[in-house]
């Protein structure tokens, strides 16, 4: 049977909550402590756990207690750390993980999570991931949270991880760069990278941290309802603050109900359509960019014949149901249409996974589409991320097609034994 897990995040997700849910699920804290010693930073922190109550519900709280604390000038209202006494660049962290002799799967997951987090922070600040120097990635507690979570999932033998929609939270929080709105910019970038479904539960606290978002965005195969599974254990990981709802991350652990069948994933999408016959064609390109920037999943046009024998176009926009109002506003504002049709449809999708590939010309992302899980997983398509390849081509003065082929060849070389 294929072992799977589902992260249910009604009150958000953070690294320490992930650790708590894993320990509550049966991962020995002593195992995590011994494995984490291989990072050779054990003198900088103490890892311990306790049982706590959140709105009357018993859960496990894992603490990453720093040996040396820097006093903060700005006490934070949020539940998680943003001020740390030790910062590191991404290459230093990657070198630390690679040299730690961790279990192979734990090592690869940890590297992928940190890379994804650095890409998000780099995008926020306009710098390359390798040059990111900020507290969230380099802090001891973030290292322990991420590597510890990957160790725990590996110890449980999880072959596929899924995640629920995420609450946005609200308010503001103090961070290394001053006061930031919640969700903080890095979290939004991470959500954007996987088009994570989000919602507001009207709680004005930081509910999703960059560390928690990076873990989910990197490791989860799909966001939404729980997959078909036989539930064997549910681990409860406690957050730090009391909230109007139990501040608990629930980790469902079990086996796939249909391990021999190809797992089909589906989601709800909105389709917007309008015919236009009196718009300057130059405006269409601008409308495309505006809609995609607003969160549209896809935008396209078709040539059509309209009344009075006029040539026109059918503008179609595909977006999540939550983005309908935003996309409609752009269409009304930027085009000459007087009406828009929209409908909700089911869309069957493949599982999508993003991996970071390092080549001689730099780092590029690769998107992998697959069906099934565990031993029944079949990779159907692999594509190099266009924007990343363009950037590498411009920097290296190499043809774009050559860069794309190098990225794909590198991925196939690294994964040929897994396919």
Swiss-Prot record:
Give the matching Gene3D superfamilies: Transcriptional regulatory protein pf0864 domain like (3.30.70.1380)
Where are the residues of the annotated region Disordered? 69-90
Coiled-coil positions are none
Q: Which Pfam families match?
A: Ni_insertion (PF01969)
Any one GO molecular function term: lyase activity
Question: What keyword terms does UniProt attach to this protein?
Answer: Nickel
Q: Which domain of life is it from?
A: Bacteria
Q: Which segments show compositional bias classed as Basic residues?
A: 79-88
InterPro entries on file: Ni_insertion
Q: Which family does it belong to?
A: Belongs to the LarC family.
Which HAMAP family does the annotation name?
LarC
The protein, known as = Putative nickel insertion protein
| The organism of origin for this protein | Rippkaea orientalis (strain PCC 8801 / RF-1)
Q: What is the lineage of its organism?
A: Bacteria, Bacillati, Cyanobacteriota, Cyanophyceae, Oscillatoriophycideae
